[in-house]
From Swiss-Prot:
This is CTP synthase. CTP binds at residues 15, 148-150, 188-193, 224. InterPro entries: Class_I_gatase-like, CTP_synthase, CTP_synthase_N, GATASE, GATase1_CTP_Synthase, P-loop_NTPase. Pfam families: CTP_synth_N, GATase. Mg(2+) binds at residues 73, 141. L-glutamine binds at residues 56, 355, 383-386, 406, 463. Homotetramer.
Length: 537
């Protein structure tokens, strides 16, 4: 079988209850005890991956080093564990069914009637074991809510796998929500009781329950949950709302959750080394920076989750607080110059993140012109870098029709155009330039100084690139190419001379930022903002 131990994390009562943060926190606390830890997210949707899903429904698509387009929870796992994960750490129903159907078409099942049990559940178990290879412990989060039809094959696979792993091979941690009535201020455990009943009916008994609530719960609520859900009192944990998601591991450690799980899995309890984590959280904020994030999908902040977290990481490192103002590029498109100045003049820095499609692009052009002309520290990511190029071509080079062929296929000045290998692509899923590629930095540039190394590996997710026909004109007018993918001579980084900080990158640096190791570009952006800003208490 395997020597890896498993923590299976299920969710009850409602979705978005915080399973991902709980799973990431547990993984981080086991790693702090010296274990080699990995994390796996199982998503019951029928999409093969998250790549073609709407950011309004699903939030951001997190891209791994190997180019997998995954659930945003993998971003939480990477940030908390400080480990690079891969496509094998995200299992979807679409991926599983695709594998099973492919095998059936090839005749691998030798004429068997292909069914959910055993064929689909076996494929799920194989994927879990493959994803956990080489780890002492794997935290496996089952997406959705117990009781969902889509989750049943995954929960059945977990039931079977637990049986095969033996009594000390795995634990189940059930994360539920405890509503508190406004009128009586009474915490209601009935939804949790029904959720556990549903979980038991599938054959899974939780070893621990994490009760999510807005405020701390009284002890009698935990005792009642313990009694009615048949979980030892020490295994019933209250995870109430805290100021930052990075406080959650300390809360779970305080509640001794990992001690309960470690004793069950490894027959021992050890101390966690949380010194550096606590030091990171203890830095005092002397001032608050206001950072404008101008994007297309700001209705759902999760669409820019990694960008927001990367800003926070840099802010913590610099000892400042960062207030991120989400601004819709659609709305800014309607503003005149005076209105635009009113919205942006009190901002200390600007980030324009990635996205797809023509909607809202002209709003970004307006914002970036303001930032360029008013010396506002600015970082453009992927689409943001492309719109920087469009704005510069129009307003500095005088190419009034300049555009990307994504937005205007017939533009006279295609400063951004389709990658040659993308010309014949028809399927959208998994067909972009994805994953980590080397970028060679030009010595003497701001970006080279920030990274302090000649070559960096950064993650990509795009089809369009800077058109080298315009490279000479850009550089002659002060927009310098400071990073290249040398094998194909692709422009990866642009930076504006004679500007405090105006940098555009074709990649997604936010995916590699970690709480204790902020990304150099976000550090550079906020450092410049700190230098320019007056203290705001």
């Amino acid at each position: 079988m395997t020597n890896t131990k498993f923590v299976f994390v299920t969710g009850g009562v409602l979705s978005s209850v915080g399973k991902g943060i709980a799973a990431a926190s547990m993984g981080m606390l086991f790693k702090a005890r010296g274990y080699k830890v990995t994390a796996i997210k199982m998503d019951p949707y029928l999409n093969v991956d998250a790549g073609t899903m709407s950011p309004y429904q699903h939030g951001e698509v997190f891209v791994t080093e190997d180019g997998a387009e995954t659930d945003l929870d993998l971003g939480h796992y990477e940030r908390f564990l400080d480990e690079n994960l891969s496509g094998k750490n995200n299992i979807t129903s679409g991926k599983i069914y695709s594998q099973v159907i492919t095998k059936e078409r090839k005749g691998d099942y030798l004429g068997s009637t292909v069914q959910v049990i055993p064929h689909v559940t076996d494929a799920i178990k194989e994927s879990i074991l493959y994803g956990a290879q080489g780890a002492d412990l794997a935290v496996v989060e089952i997406g959705g809510t117990v009781g969902d039809i889509e989750s049943l094959p995954f929960l059945e696979a977990v039931r079977q796998l637990r049986r095969e792993l033996g009594p000390n091979g795995s634990v189940v941690v059930h994360v539920t929500y405890v509503p508190i009535l406004e009128t009586t201020h009474e915490a209601k455990t009935k939804p949790t009781q029904h959720s556990v009943k549903e979980l038991r009916s599938i054959g899974l008994q939780p070893d621990a329950i994490v009760l999510r609530s807005h405020t701390p719960l009284e002890k009698h609520v935990l005792e009642k949950t313990s009694l009615f859900c048949d979980v030892p009192l020490e295994g019933v944990i209250n995870s109430y709302d805290v100021e930052s998601v990075y406080d959650v591991p300390l809360l779970l450690e305080q509640e001794k959750l990992i001690s309960v799980l470690e004793e069950r899995l490894f027959g021992t309890t050890t101390e966690a080394d949380l010194k550096k984590w606590k030091e990171m959280l203890s830095r005092q904020s002397e001032r608050t920076l206001k950072v404008a994030l101008v994007g297309k999908y700001v209705v759902l902040p999760d669409a820019y989750l990694s960008v927001i977290e990367a800003i926070r990481h840099a802010a913590m490192k610099l000892g400042v607080a960062a207030h991120v103002s989400l601004m819709s590029s659609d709305e800014l498109e309607k503003c005149d110059d005076e209105q635009l100045s009113e919205k942006l003049s009190n901002m200390d820095a600007l980030v324009v993140p990635g996205g797809f499609g023509a909607r809202g692009i002209e709003g970004m052009v307006k914002v970036l012109r303001y930032a360029r002309e008013n010396k506002m520290p600015t970082l453009g990511l992927c689409l943001g870098m492309q719109v920087m190029s469009i704005e510069f071509a129009r307003n500095v080079l005088g190419l009034k029709d300049a555009n990307s062929t994504e937005f205007d296929p017939n533009t006279t000045y295609p400063v951004i155009s389709l990658l040659p290998e993308q010309m014949q692509v028809r399927d959208l899923g998994g067909s972009m330039r994805l994953g980590a590629y080397p970028c060679t930095l030009v010595e003497g540039t701001r970006v080279h100084a920030l990274y302090n190394k000649p070559v960096v590996f950064e993650r990509h997710r795009h089809r369009f690139e800077f058109n080298n026909e315009f490279r000479e004109a850009f550089e002659n007018n002060g927009f310098q190419v400071s990073g290249l993918y040398e094998p194909k001579d692709l422009v990866e980084v642009l930076e504006l001379k004679d500007h405090p900080f105006y940098v555009g990158v074709q990649y997604h640096p936010e995916f590699k930022s970690r709480p204790m190791v902020p990304h150099p570009l976000f550090l550079g952006l906020l450092s410049e903002a700190v230098a320019k800003a007056s203290p705001v208490l």
